[in-house]
UniProtKB/Swiss-Prot annotation:
It comes from Salmonella paratyphi A (strain AKU_12601). Residues 382-392 have a biased composition (Gly residues). InterPro entries: DNA_mismatch_repair_CS, DNA_mismatch_repair_MutL, DNA_mismatch_S5_2-like, HATPase_C_sf, MutL/Mlh/PMS, MutL/Mlh/Pms-like, MutL_C, MutL_C_dimsub. It comes from the Bacteria. Keywords: DNA damage, DNA repair. This is DNA mismatch repair protein MutL.
C-alpha cells in the first residue's frame, strides 16, 4: 500500500481515540472550553449516559462568526500562538483538536454569539472532508455545544461503552472534580431531563467548605485539616483528612489540582502518602483535596493525551514542599474540649439507606469535642534552617536582651491563674448581684469571642459557649412544651429494634422538646422539630440523636436538650458586633442565671491593672 495522506475525517477519528475515550471525556473537554471562555455558569444536559445527547451551554465570551469554521478544524485554537505560550500554559485547553475529534465521531452542532454580534450563528461539520456549514441561529451571549449519537460511525468504539448508569457516573465524577477546581462557577448537571447536581458559585471560605461537604461528604469535612503553605513561587492550599480517623470510604477522596488543572500525578500522591505513612495502616490511603500553584514555566502539562499528568522541572523541590506542608498540618492539629458536661457521643456508624435518605451536605454538623484550625506555615520564604522557620531574636535589627527579674515577676503575676477552693463546677467570677447585663460589647476577638466592659472591668466572653447555653434554654420546656414546627417534607429513616425501642420510650419527652415522629415496623418518620433545629442538617442530626438515645438507660428532657445544644451547627462561623449584641440580649432574657453566676468556660476576666503595671516597669 503506497504512502498517502489520510482523509480529514479518518485522521480526526484516529485522534479521537486518544481524546474521546468515553462520554465523560467529551464532557471534560467541552466544560473546560467553557471555563477558558470565562463562563460563570455551565449547564450540562445528558441523555442515556451521554450516548444519545451531550449538551453543554455556557455564558462565556462566545465565538465570532468568522471563527466558527476554524473552531471545528484540527489544530486551531485561541489559547496559544507560539512556543513561549506553550511553555507557560495557563488555560485548560491548548491543542485545538478536541472539537475536531469529537465532531468526527458524533453529530456535533456548535451555536455561539459574542456580545458584539447582533445575532448568533450555528456551525456543524459533515461529510468525508468535514466541511463546515454556518447558518444564523437564536442564542444568548455564550456558546452551546450539542453532541448527538456519540460513536455512531465507529461501531467498535460504541460496543465498548458501558451501561447508561456507569457512563453517567463517570460524567458525574468529572463534574465533581471541576466543581472542586472552580468554586466561582455555577455548574448544573441534568440526566434524562432531571436535575441531578447543582453547584452554585461561592466566594467565601465558609461557603467553599459547604461545597466541599456536598461533593466529598460530611465525614470528610468533619476530619478535614486545612492547609495553607507557601515557599517561593510554590503555594499549597486545600484539605487533608486526619489519618487517625481515615476510613475506607474516605480513601476514595483523592483530588489534586495543579494551577487549577485536575491531576493524577504519582509524585504528588507519593509526597502525601509519605507525610501520612506513620499514621496510616498498610492498606489505607490518605484522603485529600489539594491545590498546588506553581510558576507555569516550571511545569510541563503537554505530556499526556488527556492532560492527566504533568512533569515538574524541579520535581524533588515540589515533592519535598508538598511533603513538608502536609506533615506540618498533621503535626500542628490540636484538640480542645467543650466546657459543657461530658456526654457520650452518638455512634458514628450510619446505615447506607439512612445516608441515602435525602442527604444534604450544605448543612454540616458541628463536631462537639474537636476544633481544628489551619496550620500556620513554618516553611516560608527561603528559610531552611533547623528552627523550622521561627524568627530568632538575632534576626531583628533592634533586638533587646531578655526581661529583668523584676519584670519577670510582674509578668508571672499577670499570667498566673488565681487559686480557688475546689468546687464541683468551675464558675467564673459573678457580676454584681443586682445586674442583669453582661455589659457593653467593645469588639470581637478572633472571630468567636466578645470583649465586654462592665462596671469598670473587662471580660472576655466565648460566643459559641453562650450560643450553646441559649440553644439549651430554647429547647428546654418550661410550663408548656416547646412549640413544634412541622416539616414540609417529613424525614423517613430506617431504625434498628433497639433504636425503635429507645424512641418509643422517650417519645413523650421528645414531644415536650418539639420533636414529633411516627414509627412503623422498621422506620421512623420525623414530622416536626423545634424552631432552633429548622436550619440544621436533620439527615445527620436526627440519626445521631437516635443513636444517643439508644445508648441511654434513663431519659430526662434536660439531658436530651443539652445533647442537642452541643451537637447543633452554629449559624455564625465568624461573629460580627451586631450578632454578638443580639446573642447576649437573648441570653440575658432567657438565661438570667448565667449573668449572675457565669459557668466555667463562658467568661474570663482580663486584668488590665496588672498589664498596665507591667508596662510601667522598665
Amino acid at each position: 500500500m503506497p504512502i498517502q495522506v489520510l482523509p480529514p475525517q479518518l485522521a480526526n477519528q484516529i485522534a479521537a481515540g486518544e481524546v474521546v475515550e468515553r462520554p465523560a471525556s467529551v464532557v471534560k473537554e467541552l466544560v473546560e472550553n467553557s471555563l477558558d471562555a470565562g463562563a460563570t455558569r455551565v449547564d450540562i444536559d445528558i441523555e442515556r449516559g451521554g450516548a444519545k445527547l451531550i449538551r453543554i451551554r455556557d455564558n462565556g465570551c462566545g465565538i465570532k462568526k468568522e471563527e466558527l469554521a476554524l473552531a471545528l478544524a484540527r489544530h486551531a485554537t485561541s489559547k496559544i500562538a507560539s512556543l513561549d505560550d506553550l511553555e507557560a500554559i495557563i488555560s485548560l485547553g491548548f491543542r485545538g483538536e478536541a472539537l475536531a475529534s469529537i465532531s468526527s465521531v458524533s453529530r456535533l452542532t456548535l451555536t455561539s454569539r459574542t456580545a458584539e454580534q447582533a445575532e448568533a450563528w450555528q456551525a456543524y461539520a459533515e461529510g468525508r472532508d468535514m466541511d463546515v456549514t454556518v447558518k444564523p441561529a437564536a442564542h444568548p451571549v455564550g456558546t452551546t455545544l450539542e453532541v448527538l449519537d456519540l460513536f455512531y460511525n465507529t461501531p467498535a468504539r460504541r460496543k465498548f461503552m458501558r451501561t447508561e448508569k456507569t457512563e453517567f457516573n463517570h460524567i458525574d465524577e468529572i463534574i465533581r472534580r471541576i466543581a472542586l477546581a472552580r468554586f466561582d462557577v455555577t455548574l448544573n448537571l441534568s440526566h434524562n431531563g432531571k436535575l441531578v447536581r447543582q453547584y452554585r458559585a461561592v466566594a467565601k471560605d465558609g461557603q467553599k467548605e459547604r461545597r466541599l461537604g456536598a461533593i466529598c461528604g460530611t465525614p470528610f469535612l468533619e476530619q478535614a485539616l486545612a492547609i495553607e503553605w507557601q515557599h517561593g513561587d510554590l503555594t499549597l492550599r486545600g484539605w487533608v483528612a486526619d489519618p487517625n480517623h481515615t476510613t475506607t470510604a474516605l480513601t476514595e477522596i483523592q483530588y489534586c489540582y495543579v494551577n487549577g488543572r485536575m491531576m493524577r500525578d504519582r509524585l504528588i500522591n507519593h509526597a502525601i502518602r509519605q507525610a501520612c505513612e506513620d499514621k496510616l495502616g498498610a492498606d489505607q490511603q490518605p484522603a485529600f483535596v489539594l491545590y498546588l500553584e506553581i510558576d507555569p514555566h516550571q511545569v510541563d502539562v503537554n505530556v499526556h493525551p488527556a492532560k492527566h499528568e504533568v512533569r515538574f522541572h524541579q520535581s524533588r523541590l515540589v515533592h519535598d514542599f508538598i511533603y513538608q506542608g502536609v506533615l506540618s498540618v498533621l503535626q500542628q492539629q490540636t484538640e480542645t474540649t467543650l466546657p459543657l458536661e461530658e456526654i457520650a457521643p452518638a455512634p458514628r456508624h450510619v446505615p447506607e439507606n439512612r445516608i441515602a435518605a435525602g442527604r444534604n451536605h450544605f448543612a454540616v454538623p458541628a463536631e462537639p469535642t474537636t476544633a481544628r484550625e489551619p496550620a500556620t506555615p513554618r516553611y516560608s520564604g527561603g528559610a531552611s534552617g533547623g528552627n523550622g522557620g521561627r524568627q530568632t531574636a538575632g534576626g531583628w535589627p533592634h533586638a533587646q536582651p531578655g526581661y529583668q527579674k523584676q519584670q519577670g515577676e510582674v509578668y508571672r503575676a499577670l499570667l498566673q491563674t488565681p487559686t480557688t477552693s475546689p468546687a464541683p463546677e468551675a464558675v467564673a467570677p459573678a457580676l454584681d448581684g443586682h445586674s442583669q447585663s453582661f455589659g457593653r460589647v467593645l469588639t470581637i476577638v478572633c472571630g468567636d469571642c466578645a470583649l465586654l466592659e462592665h462596671a469598670g472591668t473587662i471580660q472576655l466572653l466565648s460566643l459559641p459557649v453562650a450560643e450553646r447555653w441559649l440553644r439549651q434554654a430554647q429547647l428546654t420546656p418550661g410550663q408548656s412544651p416547646v412549640c413544634a414546627q412541622p416539616l414540609l417534607i417529613p424525614l423517613r429513616l430506617k431504625v434498628s429494634a433497639d433504636e425503635k425501642a429507645a424512641l418509643q420510650k422517650a417519645q413523650s419527652l421528645l414531644g415536650e422538646l418539639g420533636i414529633e415522629f411516627q414509627s412503623d415496623a422498621q422506620h421512623v418518620t420525623i414530622r416536626a422539630v423545634p424552631l432552633p433545629l429548622r436550619q440544621q442538617n436533620l439527615q445527620i442530626l436526627i440519626p445521631e440523636l437516635i443513636g444517643y438515645l439508644a445508648q441511654q438507660t434513663t431519659f430526662a428532657t434536660v439531658n436530651i436538650a443539652q445533647w442537642i445544644a452541643r451537637n447543633v451547627q452554629s449559624e455564625h462561623p465568624q461573629w460580627s458586633m451586631a450578632q454578638a449584641i443580639s446573642l447576649l440580649a437573648d441570653v440575658e432574657r432567657l438565661c438570667p442565671q448565667l449573668v449572675k453566676a457565669p459557668p466555667g468556660g463562658l467568661l474570663q476576666p482580663v486584668d488590665l491593672h496588672s498589664a498596665m503595671n507591667a508596662l510601667k516597669h522598665e
